[in-house]
Amino acid sequence: MSIGILGKKLGMSQFFDEEGKAVPVTLIEAGPCRITQLKSIDTDGYTAVQLGYGETRQKLVNKPSKGHLARSGEQLLSHLREYRVETIDGLKLGNSITVEDFKAGQKVDVSGDSMGRGFSGYQKRHGFSRGPMTHGSKNHREPGSTGAGTTPGRIYPGKRMAGRYGGKQITTRGLVIVKVDTGHNLLVVKGSVPGKPGSLLNIFPAKGVNSKFANGGK
């Protein structure tokens, strides 16, 4: 049973399948993640598993977090995530979740922070078409009309305009695991995932629209 796992994006590469075709893949260094808390219906009203990832220093962890982490082990961790599960039977505080819980061919969702691009214009942020470049035109990269004048006399909320682009948490769904390397704690996932190399990723079994067909189901 794969609960979920935290990891770090290493970068993209290519993988050759059995037919010799090159498949674009992302390398993710996932886990090991320590079970830091088990939640049950009796104590919390629902069942869940909390995992910790990423060793850190004493000065970077506050006193309440140190007490919380001390229940499951000595090493301090910098990232905590919670995963809902149907049952916590067989799970124990301090145990590790590794890539061995995943298998090739399994579909997963990958969540992370997208690459921040700062304040960006209409073309870069929303893919607007540019204006004419010649014949006296002066509106090469301007947006054009943003609405009528007298009525409504304002710009509607949600209008696509220039602004901060990227740096938000997004989820890429239905990615297929091509290979699991237990020796190096690697998940090789087909396609791209959010974030830049070195950023934190949350990997969990596929949910949502494709959940019916995820993980080999019919």
Curated annotation (Swiss-Prot):
Record InterPro entries: Ribosomal_uL3, Ribosomal_uL3_bac/org-type, Ribosomal_uL3_CS, Transl_B-barrel_sf
Pfam assignment, any one: Ribosomal_L3
MF-aspect GO terms: rRNA binding; structural constituent of ribosome
Alphabetized Gene3D superfamilies for the sequence: 3.30.160.810, Translation factors
Subcellular location: Plastid, Organellar chromatophore
Protein family according to the UniProt entry: Belongs to the universal ribosomal protein uL3 family.
Subunit structure: Part of the 50S ribosomal subunit.
Purpose of the protein: One of the primary rRNA binding proteins, it binds directly near the 3'-end of the 23S rRNA, where it nucleates assembly of the 50S subunit.
Name of the molecule in the record: Large ribosomal subunit protein uL3c
Source organism (scientific name): Paulinella chromatophora
